[in-house]
């Protein structure tokens, strides 16, 4: 009978599982009245305190019984924190930490115990990650313990200027990334940290380093030459007076046009410490000299000087113009004018010879006054090194003309005054005899 009763209970149990409950409650608790039933009572539908129980992740309304010892988001690096250098040990909070937004707002106002001056260092997205810069917390060395915390706000005030120009270039020009100059009061405090400043602040590569090689535009196909473009030259092209944009600079460097050509060029410039803003407007008018790099412009000026020196018909021009002024009464006055003009040209060429504008890899020390040197540098930057040598070559051709004109004037004067010629020849013969003795 007991066996049949057990089978009936099992059958009713199956019906209860399929049909549900009649009064809204399950029949499972009724099985506890059967003393010899192999089934045990069902566990309650509420959590009981248990040391081994791990609560699942639920929204904040769920309250666990045992206290939470750590912030569940402590493993996530907070981009708005000042990282391990300023981190304070987190207190133990009993129970769920509550709304994280309120906790973060409290941390942002207190800055984890730091002085109130650090609250002005926004936006924090401009700062580089301290872990990446130091390559781990051990790179700080033993000098971190001696670093006073109260001096850190003054030292960190220089961080927003990391992206500012590190050299004397106007604001609208290329931004050159360089080491930040710290004041004397803060240098002692920061010097205790053995940090590579080039890695921390974005070091600038050597200005004499070759950025790329550009084929010449004026050379023939049979003798194509390439010119090396240095980092200093790229910086000069991005700076006043030209202020080239990405499109013009890509044309100067003979880069192929592509969809992301400007972006790739800006990324390449950023690696060498130069920043080319997007949507920049050029400052100077575009000429044919704009397409030339400095090496080719200097080469062109040298060839132009050679042609002026060797091929300019200075003697023919001087004889032609002197025939138009063959009057003996004008020859003396004309000769004086030619001598004065030659002296003025000599002064002009001597001034241009003292020009010390930066060109290529050279940055010579200036000789002239800053006022006149800055004007010559402006002209040299516009012409990329072609201007001053070309002007000197042209003035040299003018001086050759003046020299030939003076020789022609002397011949005309001697032809018109034969007696003076004999007197001069006699005097010259007497001088030669005295010199022989």
From Swiss-Prot:
A motif (PPxY motif) lies at residues 57-62. One of its GO terms (molecular function) is chromatin binding. There is a cross-link at residues 10, 177, 184 (Glycyl lysine isopeptide (Lys-Gly) (interchain with G-Cter in SUMO2)). Residues 14-107, 414-437 are annotated as: Disordered. Residues 428-437 have a biased composition (Basic and acidic residues). Induction: All isoforms are induced during retinoic acid-mediated differentiation and by cAMP stimulation of primary astrocytes. Isoform 3 is most strongly induced in the former case, isoform 1 in the latter case. Residues 65-74, 88-101 have a biased composition (Low complexity). Sequence-specific DNA-binding protein that interacts with inducible viral and cellular enhancer elements to regulate transcription of selected genes. AP-2 factors bind to the consensus sequence 5'-GCCNNNGGC-3' and activate genes involved in a large spectrum of important biological functions including proper eye, face, body wall, limb and neural tube development. They also suppress a number of genes including MCAM/MUC18, C/EBP alpha and MYC. AP-2-alpha is the only AP-2 protein required for early morphogenesis of the lens vesicle. This is Transcription factor AP-2-alpha. It comes from Mus musculus (Mouse).
């Amino acid at each position: 009978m007991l066996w049949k009763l057990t089978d009936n209970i099992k059958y009713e149990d199956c019906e209860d599982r399929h049909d549900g409950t009649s009064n809204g409650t399950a029949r499972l608790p009724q099985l506890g009245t059967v003393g010899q039933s192999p089934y045990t009572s069902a566990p309650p539908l509420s959590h009981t305190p248990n040391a081994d129980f791990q609560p699942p992740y639920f929204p904040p309304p769920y309250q666990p019984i045992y206290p939470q010892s750590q912030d569940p988001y402590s493993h996530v690096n907070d981009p708005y924190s000042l990282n391990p250098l300023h981190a304070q040990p987190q207190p133990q909070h009993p129970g769920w930490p509550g709304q994280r937004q309120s906790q973060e707002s409290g941390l942002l106002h207190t800055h984890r115990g730091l002085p109130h001056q650090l609250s002005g260092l926004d936006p924090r997205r401009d700062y580089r990650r301290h872990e990446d810069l130091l390559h781990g917390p051990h790179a700080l060395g033993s000098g971190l313990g001696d670093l006073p915390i109260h001096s850190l706000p003054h030292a960190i005030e220089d961080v927003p200027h990391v992206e500012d120009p590190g050299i004397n270039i106007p604001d609208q020009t290329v931004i050159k990334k360089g080491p930040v100059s710290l004041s004397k009061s803060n240098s002692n405090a920061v010097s205790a940290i053995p940090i590579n400043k080039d890695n921390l602040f974005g070091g600038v590569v050597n200005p004499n380093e070759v950025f790329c090689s550009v084929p010449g535009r004026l050379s023939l196909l049979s003798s194509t030459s390439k010119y090396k473009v240095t980092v200093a030259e790229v910086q000069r092209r991005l700076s006043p007076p030209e202020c080239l944009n990405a499109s013009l600079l890509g044309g100067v460097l003979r880069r192929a046009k592509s969809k992301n050509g400007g972006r790739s060029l800006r990324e390449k410039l950023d690696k060498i410490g130069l920043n080319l803003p997007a949507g920049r407007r050029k400052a100077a008018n575009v000429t044919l000299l704009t397409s030339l790099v400095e090496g080719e412009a200097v080469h062109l000026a040298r060839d132009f000087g050679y042609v002026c020196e060797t091929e300019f018909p200075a003697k023919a021009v001087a004889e032609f113009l002197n025939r138009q002024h063959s009057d003996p009464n004008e020859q003396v006055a004309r000769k004086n004018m030619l001598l004065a003009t030659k002296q003025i040209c000599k002064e002009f060429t001597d001034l241009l010879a003292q020009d010390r504008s930066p060109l290529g890899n050279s940055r010579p020390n200036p000789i002239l006054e800053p006022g006149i040197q800055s004007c010559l540098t402006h002209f040299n930057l516009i012409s990329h090194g072609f201007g001053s040598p070309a002007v000197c070559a042209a003035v040299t051709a003018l001086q050759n003309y003046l020299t030939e004109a003076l020789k022609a004037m002397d011949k005309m004067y001697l032809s018109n005054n034969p007696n003076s010629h004999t007197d001069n020849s006699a005097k010259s013969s007497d001088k030669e005899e005295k010199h022989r003795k």
